[in-house]
Curated annotation (Swiss-Prot):
GO terms for molecular function: ATP binding; UDP-N-acetylmuramoylalanine-D-glutamate ligase activity. Signal peptide: none annotated. GO terms for biological process: cell division; cell wall organization; peptidoglycan biosynthetic process; regulation of cell shape. The lineage of its organism: Bacteria, Bacillati, Bacillota, Clostridia, Eubacteriales. This is UDP-N-acetylmuramoylalanine--D-glutamate ligase. It comes from Clostridium botulinum (strain Okra / Type B1). It comes from the Bacteria. InterPro entries: Mur-like_cat_sf (IPR036565), Mur_ligase_C (IPR004101), Mur_ligase_C_dom_sf (IPR036615), Mur_ligase_cen (IPR013221), MurD (IPR005762).
């Protein structure tokens, strides 16, 4: 049973509240807390000069600022602390604050706890954003007032009082957001699981444990959707507290969705033929099947079919840019893990020229080399992980006794130039980094946009 938001309003009024992080996603939260009568202090590692006008904007509405390198040293004396998702709860500063009586939470935890609408939560290693968008589009097509947020869209907590019981909310949830959750969405999905974010999580086990929080606090009338083709997620059925639906690309599924004789079906009913889908790759068929399971109780087959056959994808996800001199360019900048890059490679019918490399999340690249060596014509590497990826591929090339040209570059511009020079008519060039962007770019969108700008200037 969800709590009435009036309880939160009564709780937060006059409280001393610390908000850690003044990033774009936290700014609406800070302003909303001020509106609710809290005495807010905002903390950030950046200095005033780097934050820009937002620092003055917040001070004008009565927010105190704690800025600079040692900003977390001053977390004492607060009733409530909203932490940024990527910051671990076991940091000494948070442990000390909690021992002193502070209530430590996050925007997403409070949102799910008090949101009056039905909440659909999507997590997993790959396919989260596309599946979140598909679920959103299907619900919207059916006529529901639908909100989308979490890792995509806009922060929703500040809009919670506009939401009603007959509305629908679709959330993309990361392992960081889920780590401290003690509340779960009513309808939850884990798309798949593979090693990721091991630069933040202690190990893969902790990463999986965090993902499980998406269903750990469900009730008996809630729904969990699992990937039958993924051993890890398939095995979670025994831990489910409510109903379970599964989806599969390779097996017949009667209690869920599957691909059967090139037809996408849900609960034995045909939705559409795979040849009529706009999205590229089998991984996107899996995303559609997962979405069907999530919305099955709320959406007609007609609405599912409309979205499946009309939705053409999300930016930076196997996104076709242009064809130049018979060479096709694709932007898959979202691919920040080896498994996501492998899924992208599998969506092409011939070996490609791959541009990869980036920030090191401490995850192995051997699975990408093992699964992708025969899908790559030329490998162009850049970023912090360039030598690590090269080493993984050189081992496989030696073992398999095959050939692949590997080129090391120092910038995106150089990567595109090398790819363009080496490409022949009919080739495919794709940016699918298998890594996060933080060594060279603030986020994957900026990385993808630079790639597109360079390609469009050829």
């Amino acid at each position: 049973m969800k709590s009435n938001f009036s309880k939160f309003k009564d709780f937060i009024k006059y409280k001393k509240v610390a908000v850690v992080g003044i990033g774009v996603s936290n700014r609406p939260l800070i302003k909303f807390l001020v509106k609710l009568g809290a005495k807010v202090t905002a903390f950030d590692k950046k200095h005033r000069e780097k934050l820009g006008s937002i620092s003055f904007e917040l001070e004008e509405i009565g927010v105190d600022l704690v800025l600079g390198e040692n900003y977390l040293d001053k977390l004492d004396g607060y009733d409530v602390i909203f932490k940024t998702p990527s910051m671990r709860i076991d940091r000494p500063e948070f442990v000390k604050a909690k021992e002193s009586g502070a209530y430590i939470t996050s925007e997403m935890e409070e949102f799910i706890k008090y949101c009056p609408a039905k909440v659909f939560g999507i997590t997993g290693s790959d396919g989260k954003t596309t599946t979140t968008t598909l679920v959103y589009e299907m619900l919207k097509r059916e006529g529901y007032r639908t909100w989308v947020g979490g890792n995509i869209g806009t922060p929703l907590f500040a809009n919670i009082e506009e939401m009603k019981e007959d509305h629908m909310v679709v959330l993309e949830l990361s392992s960081f957001q889920l780590m401290t959750m003690d509340v779960s969405p009513e309808i939850s999905l884990i798309t798949n699981l593979s090693p990721n974010h091991l630069d933040v999580h202690k190990d893969f086990e902790e990463y999986v444990w965090a993902k499980k929080n998406i269903f750990k606090y469900q009730s008996s009338n809630n729904l969990l959707v699992l990937n039958k083709d993924d051993d890890l997620t398939n095995g979670m059925e025994n831990e489910a507290l409510g109903d379970v639906l599964k989806f599969s690309l390779v097996e017949k599924v009667y209690n869920g969705a599957c691909l059967s004789n090139n037809k996408l079906t849900i609960q034995g009913k045909e939705v559409c033929d795979s040849k009529d889908i706009n999205l590229k790759g089998r991984h996107n068929i899996a995303n559609l099947l997962a979405a069907f399971c999530m919305v099955n109780k709320y959406v007609s087959i007609d609405s599912m079919k409309y979205v499946a056959t009309n939705f053409s994808g999300v930016e930076h996800r196997c996104e076709f840019i242009r064809e130049v001199n018979g060479v096709k360019y694709y932007n898959d900048s979202i691919a920040s893990s080896p498994s996501r890059t492998l899924a992208g490679l599998n969506s092409f019918e011939k070996p490609v020229i791959l541009i990869a490399g980036g920030y090191d999340k401490k995850i192995p690249f051997e699975p990408l080399a093992e699964g992708g060596y025969d899908k790559i014509k030329i490998l162009i590497l850049m970023g912090d992980t360039k030598n690590k990826i090269r080493s993984a591929f050189e081992k496989v090339i030696s073992y398999k006794k095959c050939e692949m040209e590997i080129v090391i570059v120092n910038s995106m511009e150089e990567a595109v130039k090398v790819a363009d020079d080496m490409a022949e008519k009919g080739d495919i060039i794709t940016l699918s980094p298998a890594c996060a962007s933080f060594d060279m770019y603030p986020n994957f969108e900026i990385r993808g946009n630079e790639f597109k700008n360079i390609v469009n200037s050829l």
